[in-house]
């Protein structure tokens, strides 16, 4: 389980910086951090710049977070995705559902 999740709450949004691998072992830790934030209905901006690996379990965490945030009236944006992660979201069709970007708009660096 090799993951680090840093959360910073700002006036307008919550910024989350994730580092490490998102897989079947680390996904529960990530979910545990994201669920309370999603339940707030806040605007979440998640920086994935330092994510070295993600499997389908990680996709599931982000889909669940997206659904919860939307239900509570907030938004979710994934930022600083590598080409590999963008491709993963693209081939699964999630790129058309979840707001993703290869660049940051002021997220945690």
Curated annotation (Swiss-Prot):
The modification Phosphoserine is found at residues 52, 56. Residues 3-109 form the STAS domain. Phosphorylated by RsbW on a serine residue. Dephosphorylated by RsbP or RsbU. The keyword tRNA processing does not apply. The modification Phosphothreonine is found at residue 57. It holds the Pfam family STAS. One of its GO terms (molecular function) is anti-sigma factor antagonist activity. Keywords: Phosphoprotein. Monomer. In stressed cells, forms a complex with RsbW. The predominant form of this complex has a stoichiometry of 2:2 (one dimer of RsbW is bound by two monomers of RsbV). Binds to RsbW in the presence of low levels of ATP or under conditions of energy or environmental stress (through dephosphorylation by RsbP or RsbU). Belongs to the anti-sigma-factor antagonist family. Positive regulator of sigma-B activity. Non-phosphorylated RsbV binds to RsbW, preventing its association with sigma-B. When phosphorylated, releases RsbW, which is then free to complex with and inactivate sigma-B. This is Anti-sigma-B factor antagonist. The gene is rsbV.
């Amino acid at each position: 389980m090799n993951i680090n999740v840093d959360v910073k709450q700002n006036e307008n949004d919550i910024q989350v910086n994730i580092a490490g691998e998102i897989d079947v072992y680390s996904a529960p830790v990530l979910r545990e951090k994201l669920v309370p934030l999603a339940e707030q209905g806040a605007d979440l901006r998640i920086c994935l710049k330092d994510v070295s690996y993600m499997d389908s379990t990680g996709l599931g965490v982000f889909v669940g977070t997206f659904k919860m945030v939307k239900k509570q009236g907030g938004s979710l944006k994934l930022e600083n995705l590598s080409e590999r992660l963008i491709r993963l979201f693209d081939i699964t069709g999630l790129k058309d559902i979840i707001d993703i970007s290869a660049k940051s708009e002021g997220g945690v660096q």
